[in-house]
């Protein structure tokens, strides 16, 4: 299990990678997402078997797990359209309104053991497609699926530092949630842990 020191290294890696990634043209980020989608599709059965191995789901349940996450990646492939801002002329006399979407920075995801592919993939594909960098803390009970998802993303061309994984329990969660360089946290888990995360 990792300690707060290693959490800090992962966050620093994401922080250092953020300026390069966030300034990359949105269509270029979409290209990487499309390549990632293709690799996921090609490796879907292998990932399902990995989920079965480490989580104990039936192969059919595991396929459903990865399929639901895959749908989010497909959605993120449309980031060029999704990321567009809005403008409205003459909101008031001689005043125009404009909305611009900008990445936040280092984002964190904390996910449970029962959906080792689906829940993390609710979080990181869209965050990364939007120009953020990401640190994922999967459940320590199912570490392998997250690692494989990250490996495929790197194969798709995601540069180093954009997607980091840390493993551990409460100490790691505490370090992630209290780190001053974390801009946003996404959490799925028990109500008890959610209350703890919220108080940090």
Language-model features, listed with the residues they occupy:
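Short, structured beta/alpha segment
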Residues: 1-49, 53
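Short phosphate-engaging motifs
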Residues: 6, 43, 47, 69, ...
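A general structural signal for well-ordered alpha-helical segments in protein cores
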Residues: 11, 33, 69-70, 146, ...
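Long amphipathic alpha-helix in the N-terminal Rossmann-like dinucleotide-binding domain
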Residues: 12, 34-44, 59-83
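Residue-level signal for inorganic ion chemistry
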Residues: 14, 29, 51, 73, ...
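Rossmann-like NAD(P) dinucleotide-binding subdomain of oxidoreductase/dehydrogenase enzymes
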Residues: 85-200
């Amino acid at each position: 299990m990792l300690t707060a020191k290693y959490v800090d290294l992962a966050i620093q890696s994401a922080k250092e990678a953020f300026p390069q990634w966030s300034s990359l043209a949105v269509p270029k980020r979409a290209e990487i997402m499309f390549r990632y989608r293709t690799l996921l599709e090609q490796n879907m059965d292998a990932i399902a078997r990995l989920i079965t191995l480490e989580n104990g789901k039936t192969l059919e349940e595991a396929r459903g797990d990865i399929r639901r996450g895959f749908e989010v990646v497909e959605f993120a492939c449309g980031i060029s359209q999704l990321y567009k801002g809005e403008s409205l002329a003459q909101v008031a006399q001689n005043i125009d309104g404009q909305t611009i979407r900008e990445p936040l920075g280092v984002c964190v995801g904390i996910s449970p053991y029962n959906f080792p592919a689906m829940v993390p993939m609710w979080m990181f594909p869209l965050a990364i497609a939007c120009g953020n960098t990401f640190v994922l803390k999967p459940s320590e009970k199912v570490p392998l699926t997250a690692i494989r998802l990250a490996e495929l993303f790197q194969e798709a061309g995601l540069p180093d530092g954009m997607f980091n994984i840390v493993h551990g329990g409460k100490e790691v969660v505490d370090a992630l949630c209290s780190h001053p360089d974390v801009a946003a946290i996404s959490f799925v888990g028990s109500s008890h842990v959610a209350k703890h995360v919220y108080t940090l």
